[in-house]
């Protein structure tokens, strides 16, 4: 978080957390889509690799599409297709022929900064990981230990149902996770106290102003100091 926000909040801390109730606020806003749609891409990650038996199944409609084999020397990536469905499956067989890492499957990709990726033999060829990027900022959704061996075939499968993600390696579940949609409250708030003061903190992360009334029960004749911090959009 921004330095000035942290400084302001750390200078205004109480010893006791107070009960806070709200009334009259709008319902939280759920952001984004309830499905993961976009480009599907396959990559040989710091290795030479072959990909075949590539198939995408739209489980919602029953439509099945197959694709040509792929082969990369010393890395490479290809767009397989784009899908807009709430339930689908991506299947392929992968084999590393040289190199020291593994494979990556990109899905739900709208651009290079907004996507989800499945690493098979990621981070020094030591894991199977599902990672989501939003505006270039990455988050690990699920991680397990796994290594890719040269010359060995791996039957890989990704299933996406709504925002539920499950990956399989050779028929066994490798990752299971949910890429949850952000939920934005109208106002975030807390209150605390010490021997002399009551501290009320409120944060509005929306792009519109909010007018609210603060009622402090059991306290008369309040003298208040208000500190307000605002800034420009991060975009």
What name fits each language-model region?
Residues 220-235:
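Acidic, Ser/Thr/Pro-rich beta/coil linker or hinge segments at domain junctions
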Residues 16-19, 113-119, 231-235:
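Acidic Ser/Thr/Pro-rich low-complexity disordered segments
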Residues 1, 207-210, 233-235:
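Flexible loop/turn segments at secondary-structure boundaries
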Residues 6, 200, 226:
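Hydrophobic, well-ordered secondary-structure elements that form the walls
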Residues 27-183:
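Extracellular glycan-recognition regions
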Residues 185-220:
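Carbohydrate-binding surface patches
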Residues 165-167, 214, 224-226:
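Short beta-strand elements bearing conserved aromatic residues within extracellular beta-rich modules
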Residues 1-30, 181-187:
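Aromatic/acidic polysaccharide-binding cleft in carbohydrate-active enzymes
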């Amino acid at each position: 978080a921004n330095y000035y926000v942290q400084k302001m909040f750390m200078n205004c801390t109480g010893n006791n957390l107070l009960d806070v109730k709200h009334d009259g606020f709008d319902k939280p806003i759920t952001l984004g889509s309830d499905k993961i749609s976009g480009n599907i891409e396959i990559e040989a990650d710091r290795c030479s690799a072959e990909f075949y038996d590539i198939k995408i199944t739209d489980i919602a409609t029953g439509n099945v599409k197959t694709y040509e084999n792929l082969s990369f020397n010393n890395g490479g990536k290809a767009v397989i297709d784009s899908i807009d469905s709430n339930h689908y499956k991506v299947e392929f067989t992968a084999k590393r022929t040289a190199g020291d890492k593994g494979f990556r499957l990109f899905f739900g990709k709208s651009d290079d900064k907004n996507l989800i990726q499945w690493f098979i033999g990621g981070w020094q060829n030591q894991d199977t990981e599902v990672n989501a990027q939003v505006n270039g900022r990455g988050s690990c959704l699920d991680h397990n230990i796994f290594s890719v061996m040269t010359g060995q075939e791996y039957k890989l499968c990704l299933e996406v149902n709504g925002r539920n993600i499950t990956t399989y390696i050779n028929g066994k579940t490798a990752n299971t996770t949910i890429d949850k949609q952000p939920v934005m409250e109208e106002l975030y708030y807390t209150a605390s106290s010490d021997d002399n003061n009551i501290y009320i903190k409120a944060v509005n992360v929306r792009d519109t102003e909010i007018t609210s009334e603060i009622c402090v029960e059991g306290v008369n004749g309040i003298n208040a100091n208000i500190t307000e911090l605002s800034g420009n959009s991060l975009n």
